[in-house]
Amino acid sequence: MLVAENARSAGIPVRLIGFDEETAPELIELFPESERRIIKVGQLGKMLKALTVFDSGYALMAGQITPRRLFKGLHPDIKAAQILFSLKRRNAETIFGAIATEIEALGITLLDARSFLDNQLASLGSMTGHSFPVSDEYLFHGIHIARECARLDIGQGCVVRKGTVLAVEAFEGTDEMLRRAGNFKTDESLFVKTVKTQQDYRFDVPCFGLRTLESMKEAGLKCAALESGKVILIDKSTVIEQARSWGISLLGFE
């Protein structure tokens, strides 16, 4: 929603291609019927056709598709089935990379997913004003583990505690990882979110929003380190304010 609002504020006309049971109803309602198409996850042919009908010069991937859709609830059309069959490995990078190739084959430029969100990126240093209750040694350990997980295409985050890895993010997503980490019921745990060294910023850019913050609170985690300028904070000011009220420290690192 922030992308659409910020683009419109800049005088850029915006159209929506949303996904049934995935795209927020309030976002869909921002667009009249003539300026939106709602399709099922996996209907790549319909998506490409909609981009052509809208005469799009640029496209931007925003939001998230529930990870389980890859295994259950996927409705691949012929185009999507062909792509999935051609992939030796099926992860976010390979799947979205293949979709990006199809989009750009239409002469459409796929934008950096951080476009129109300059003021929503993680900032360097403390974002909540709290002193960060994790030593540099253990912070650097968490950053190293998160970056290695990202490099190996496992995921973009991890939870560590004093040099011990409690959980790593895999295909189930951040919230499920945080729930698993919370099962240890220990203090001084640190959640780290990063990007790949060779991140393709057209898709799968890590995000941190109120839902993630709520998952941290439920799991009893009080510290999060986010790569500055890379991780998107969805509704940044609200997230920071809520983090302060819950006593959760947010730190941006580079």
Regions found by a protein language model. Give the residues of each.
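Conserved mixed alpha/beta catalytic, RNA-binding, or beta-rich assembly cores of soluble enzyme
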Residues: M1, A7-S9, I38, R89-E93, ...
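Feature captures the catalytic cores and cofactor-binding loops of soluble hydro-lyases/lyases
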Residues: L2, I17-S56, G73-I83, N91, ...
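Residues at the starts of beta-strands that form the adenosine-phosphate
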Residues: I12-R15
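Fold-independent oxyanion-binding glycine-rich loops
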Residues: G18-E21, V41, A62-I65, L106, ...
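N-terminal glycine-rich phosphate/adenylate-binding segment common to multiple enzyme folds
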Residues: L44-R114
